[in-house]
Structure formats: C-alpha cells, structure tokens
C-alpha cells in the first residue's frame, strides 16, 4: 500500500531535498504538500487503496494521506509507520469514526506523529490503537466470515478528558 509510484514521486519532487541535519523541516513540508495535493474527501477510497492510487486520484481520506506520507518518507530513507486510532472531537464524547496518521522516526526524538489530514501533529486528544507498516497491519478491526449469513458489527467508542 505504501510503494511510491510516479504520482507519489511527483509529490516528493515538489518538496525540497531533505536536510540530513533537519529531517523535521522536510517532514513538515512533505505533510503540507500532501495535504495541498490530495484533497480530503470522505468515502472516495477503501482500506486497500494504495498511496499511488490516492495520489493519482488527488483525493482521499486520512489513511490515504498517511500512506502517501509513509511512502515518501521511506523514499527519503526516513523510517515511517502507520497509526490507527481515534481523535477526540471537542464537541462530543461519542466518537463516530476511526482516524489514521503517520509517524516518522527521528534520531534523538523517536517516533514523531504527523496528522496530514488535519495539518497538525498529534497531541493528547489522539488515542493510538495500533501501529504497523500500513493500514493492513494496523487495522482497528479485522476478521473473516465464511458463509452467507447477515452480520452487523457495532463499535461504540467514548473518548473524554479525565
């Protein structure tokens, strides 16, 4: 899901070359470039949408932004991973959707988060559920069904400050 193709590489070329001494500057510029080039549009992609497909479509959701960021960071030899979880919405306790963001490993700092969809770095409102190489490794819920029976999965999440 995070292999860079021509469209992801085109985004990478628009960001100034990473300074080995200041990778955070590059990563913030990369995050902003992805947000500018790939419009957030709910419902336009799925869990199997690749970074390249989202970049080619020019639209996606948080997981697509994270996949593109991860592909680009890795192309610059910066370790990056996918994070799935929840973002506490200030106007409600009950959360209606999962959220995704990316993290890059910076020497001396460790894993640094980038929420490309919202244009910010994660803060205490973010609840991490899983990390992995991509969505498939960090999906909040996975499973398999055999047979033709109907089913419904319901998940209720409440996130509140203590």
Predicted regions and their residues:
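Hydrophobic/aromatic-rich core segments of domains that either
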Residues: 17, 32, 64-147
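Secondary-structure boundary elements
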Residues: 1-60, 68, 135, 145-161
């Amino acid at each position: 899901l995070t292999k860079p193709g021509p469209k992801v590489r085109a985004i990478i070329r628009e960001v100034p070359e990473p300074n080995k001494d200041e990778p955070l500057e590059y990563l913030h510029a990369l995050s902003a470039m992805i947000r500018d080039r790939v419009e957030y549009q709910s419902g336009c992609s799925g869990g199997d949408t690749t970074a390249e497909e989202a970049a080619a479509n020019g639209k996606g959701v948080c997981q697509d932004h994270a996949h593109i960021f991860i592909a680009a960071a890795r192309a610059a030899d910066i370790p990056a991973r996918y994070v799935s979880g929840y973002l506490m919405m200030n106007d409600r306790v009950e959360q209606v959707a999962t959220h995704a963001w990316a993290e890059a490993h910076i020497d001396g700092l460790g894993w640094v988060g980038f929420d490309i969809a919202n244009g910010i770095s994660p803060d205490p409102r973010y609840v991490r559920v899983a990390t992995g190489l991509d969505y498939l490794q960090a999906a909040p819920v996975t499973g398999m069904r055999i047979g033709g029976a109907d089913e419904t999965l319901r998940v209720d999440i409440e996130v509140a400050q203590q």
